[in-house]
Design a protein with these regions (language model features):
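Core beta-strand-centered patch of the WYL/Sm-like small regulatory domain
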Residues: 1-95, 104
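Polybasic (Lys/Arg-rich)
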Residues: 79-173
Length: 173
């Protein structure tokens, strides 16, 4: 991990083994997503930014090749909620209603840096806005807090969650 950190700091290309395959990577950032550590990197083979589970990276070797990368893309990962974050997709707004039973938790620890309160109700329930890049960034969180979270918008997110619940209940009854 020290070699990876050094490569990020010096913007140096690395070679490593990931999932039993040799990789050439441009390491960009180490990030904790859902309690797992990931290396955010530009992978030459796929010609895209990828997330690799940090503990699965083996035999790291620094190369004598330095690189530059768009800092805006790298800083975009600061708003990632989980590994479903998509760096090349423009973030879009979702709005949620948070019942008073859970609102304090989201005020204490925001979902990500884009969270803002749109409305506070007398009973301490709130409406919030958050920016995401993929529905799967937020669906697990919403489903874990049901019935205390409701989707205000977009409607497609609401339909996806409803479909997930219908599928679940069809298998359990």
């Amino acid at each position: 991990i020290i070699k990876v950190k050094n490569a990020i700091k010096t913007k140096t290309k690395i070679e490593c083994i990931y999932n039993d395959k040799k990789r050439e990577l441009y390491p960009l950032k180490i990030l904790n997503l859902d309690s797992f550590w990931y290396l955010i990197n530009y992978d030459l083979e796929y010609n895209e930014i990828r997330r690799y589970h940090l503990n699965s990276i083996k035999k790291v070797e620094l190369q004598d090749i330095e690189f530059d990368f768009d800092e805006e893309i790298i800083s975009g990962f600061d708003n990632a909620i989980n590994a479903y974050f998509e760096p090349h997709i423009k973030p879009f707004s979702i709005e949620l209603f948070l019942d008073k039973k859970v609102s304090k938790y989201f005020l204490r620890k925001p979902i990500n840096q884009t969270q803002r309160v749109l409305k506070t109700y007398e009973d301490e329930s709130i409406d919030i806005e958050v920016f995401i890049t993929d529905f799967m960034e937020i669906i697990p969180l919403i489903q874990s807090y049901l019935p205390y979270i409701m989707v205000i918008s977009p409607d497609e997110l609401n339909k996806t969650i409803k479909s997930n619940l219908e599928e679940y209940f069809s298998k359990t009854t």
